[in-house]
Amino acid sequence: MMNLLSNDGVQVLPRPFTLNERRREVRSFVLRQGHFTPAQKRAFDHYWPRFGVDFIGQLRDLDVLFGRSAPKVLEVGFGNGAALRFAAQHEPRYDYIGIEVYAPGVGRLLNGLAEDGSRHVRLYHYDAVEVLNKEIVDGALDEIRIYFPDPWHKKRHHKRRLIQPLFATLLVRKLRVGGCLHMATDWADYAEQMWDVLDATPGLVNRAGLRGQVPCPDWRVQTRFERRGQNLGHRVWDLLYDRV
């Protein structure tokens, strides 16, 4: 059951959206279609009611959504879900929220979560900016993870990169004081842009010092994107910022 709060604190229980309705509702980006297998389609049909959160545009009480009070971790753009699934398996004391627009990746993770018997993961198939702006209360998150966002490697496309000043300010708003922001990239110039943006964002302090990086933490499993980058000779930058 979804748990929403209206402006006057009244609980609102909307009807679930179908997969086609979720696709039509997204307006701020073009969904990557990819190859949507029958198994992934069945995952939406069978497991979305258990793990899925339909975008409504109203603030949510996350403790009610998960049925408990626990630290909340958000992963933006979880891809095929490998990192999020790994974290949920190995850090069960956390509640996890994942956001992804790539339907096959969502379907794959739904199948994995059902196989694992996970109870503390909720997924959005929607635009992260919209979810953060309209459904996540300020200061509600203990950690935000963004692993290997699209580098938009051509210079003329850099403006499309996710990590921009306005988005960084939004992330700061949603993190509680004492929380952290963890990002990883295998593109050197994107790491430079992340440092440029985040070091200039009030409320964030690089745990490794100015333009510093940390070793890959235990909670981040190596993804196929990371392995692909390493095969191309790319190194990986893990950046960890504390919310102050």
Swiss-Prot record:
The keyword Transferase applies. Its EC number is 2.1.1.33. Keywords: Methyltransferase, S-adenosyl-L-methionine, Transferase, tRNA processing. GO terms for molecular function: tRNA (guanine(46)-N7)-methyltransferase activity. S-adenosyl-L-methionine binds at E75, E100, D127, D150. Catalyzes the formation of N(7)-methylguanine at position 46 (m7G46) in tRNA. This is tRNA (guanine-N(7)-)-methyltransferase. It comes from Xylella fastidiosa (strain 9a5c). The gene is trmB.
